[in-house]
Amino acid sequence: MNTELVAMEPGVSRNGVRTETTTNPSLGLHTYDIVVVVIYFVFVLAVGIWSSIRASRGTVGGYFLAGRSMTWWPIGASLMSSNVGSGLFIGLAGTGAAGGLAVGGFEWNATFLLLALGWIFVPVYIAAGVVTMPQYLKKRFGGQRIQVYMSVLSLILYIFTKISTDIFSGALFIQMALGWNLYLSTVILLVVTAVYTIAGGLTAVIYTDALQTVIMVGGALVLMFLGFQEVGWYPGLQQLYRQAIPNTTVPNTTCHLPRPDAFHMLRDPVNGDIPWPGLIFGLTVLATWCWCTDQVIVQRSLAAKNLSHAKGGSVLGGYLKILPMFFIVMPGMISRALYPDEVACVDPDICQRVCGARVGCSNIAYPKLVMALMPVGLRGLMIAVIMAALMSSLTSIFNSSSTLFAIDVWQRFRRQASEQELMVVGRLFVVFLVVISILWIPIIQSSNSGQLFDYIQSITSYLAPPITALFLLAIFCKRVNEPGAFWGLMFGLVVGILRMILEFSYSAPACGEMDRRPAVLKDFHYLYFALLLCGLTAIIIVVISFFTEPIPDDKLARLTWWTRNCAVSDLQKKTSVSVNNTEDDNSPGLAGRPVVEGPAGDEEEANTTQGPEQPGALHRSWGKWLWNWFCGLSGAPQQALSPAEKAVLEQKLTSIEEEPLWRRVCNINAIILLAINIFLWGYFA
């Protein structure tokens, strides 16, 4: 459908809805808004300090796995808030404004994988007795090259994708809503976030995540109801969204028109912007990596008291992941329906004036709706919501990155590192991440805001599928060995990088430009590519494994789905010890200390290291005392457990037994959750 350049009366769109034409309105915060934001920060710091004081922070397990003491509800809330960062509020609402409901499938797909995490992956991880995902691969396959590759790859992804996305999105909202200085506001957020992450470890992170989840869901639901009230609820949204055309368009193009399939989840497999086979199958590959093998997510479930609490956390997280479709995607569509001249702009000059990006301004959909619809006081609440999303995701990344660095990287260089050294190194690495995050701000500012989220998605589709294939085969196929796993990963990495080079060599065309990209890019969706890459990597892993020597069955005890319930006999213990002692890449920082092997750090263990103050302790300076508390260092000497005590503790920490009642409760709730999710897919398909 061709249109001509149209200039209508300012402030009136084609659908007759009044729109605001000011690009950067100077909206001063009311006193009530400021009070709400201050109360939010006070609550977060109070919860962080409270959880830091009560936490077991002086051991690897206490700091990195919350002492294996978390119950189901903070785990479920933390799973939600760790994933729903400020980037999701900005990016998901923006994609919904541009393309409709289909992007909500990314959230609903997570429900299935969260249940897979609790019922399939976590039992194996707990039985294996691991703290990090690279550590599991090392136990499963032996050798060190896979562990080091996975650790470094994860850290690179965290620093240059997750952290940068969240900071960019939070900065975009703060700039538009508050007019604060970008650097000052971001530095304050990062410093407050880092302080309770460093001080309290995973316990502080999970409890503050739980608080922020309540704030996020509550504030977002308020905005959702106000938005639906403004457009006439769902029927009104359907009508107004289809008419949401900006006043100024590019001649002879259809870029400005809303998609005709905007209210359908399942779209054409060839011409759809999110084809349905890719949404169901290709996305599952990426989601498996995100929810079942990514350290940020899995670490929360590994902190559970027992397997039933881990399953309960997955169920709660699955229910919470149903909500973003309604309080993020649909408000994004409402924003386009109400303010098409800004949110749906297509003329590059107008877009540059509105949001500073010539390719489009869909990213401002959510903050635009907040500033236009929320009344005094509630506007401050929504600012707190975005800050909560930003800080909760950053704390998760900081804590998980410090875990990976201390356990999987630092111990490669310091094989005899003491437990206290690991605690200090993990905390100092968080400081390093904060510095990198601040230095990354100018790069984010100069980046094209319209391409940043495409960049994040493409990075995932290029690098995640081989990891998904490896973990699935590691857990379900005992025949897979280390050579097959390593060379399969290398093959997947090379193919993914080749696609990445093509992607960034040929940028997507702007509205009105001819698409000159090769067919492998413009006609082969990245979700299809993810599915293909996962399949090819799996084939390479299996073929090489079958042509090389298999791993003996006695070395796979409690490391696969089929051997997760194997009793830890004396023979298996000796085998495990001999493997660790003969491997060149042994990690004495974990295995060499009796209380830290596997998911170390139970509350009982913490008590053995938190002894009474020494007689000379009263003469220590307050500064030294504060430093020792901050770093989780105890003045008392560590007490080594006897072999019998160690065996009892290790058996407790690696137990996947469940009480029959709670196992049935979890199973019933999982079935109900699946039924609700499948109904929603069918209703919006």
Swiss-Prot record:
Keywords: Cell membrane, Glycoprotein, Ion transport, Membrane, Sodium, Sodium transport, Sugar transport, Symport, Transmembrane, Transmembrane helix, Transport. It is found in: Cell membrane. It comes from the Eukaryota. Residues 1-20, 577-616 are annotated as: Disordered. One of its GO terms (cellular component) is plasma membrane. Glycans are attached at residue 247. GO terms for biological process: sodium ion transport. Belongs to the sodium:solute symporter (SSF) (TC 2.A.21) family. PANTHER family: SODIUM_GLUCOSE COTRANSPORTER 4 (PTHR11819:SF96), SOLUTE CARRIER FAMILY 5 (PTHR11819). Electrogenic Na(+)-coupled sugar symporter that may play a primary role in D-mannose and possibly D-fructose and D-glucose transport at the plasma membrane. Transporter activity is driven by a transmembrane Na(+) electrochemical gradient set by the Na(+)/K(+) pump. Exclusively recognizes sugar substrates having a pyranose ring with an axial hydroxyl group on carbon 2. This is Sodium/glucose cotransporter 4. It comes from Mus musculus (Mouse). The gene is Slc5a9.
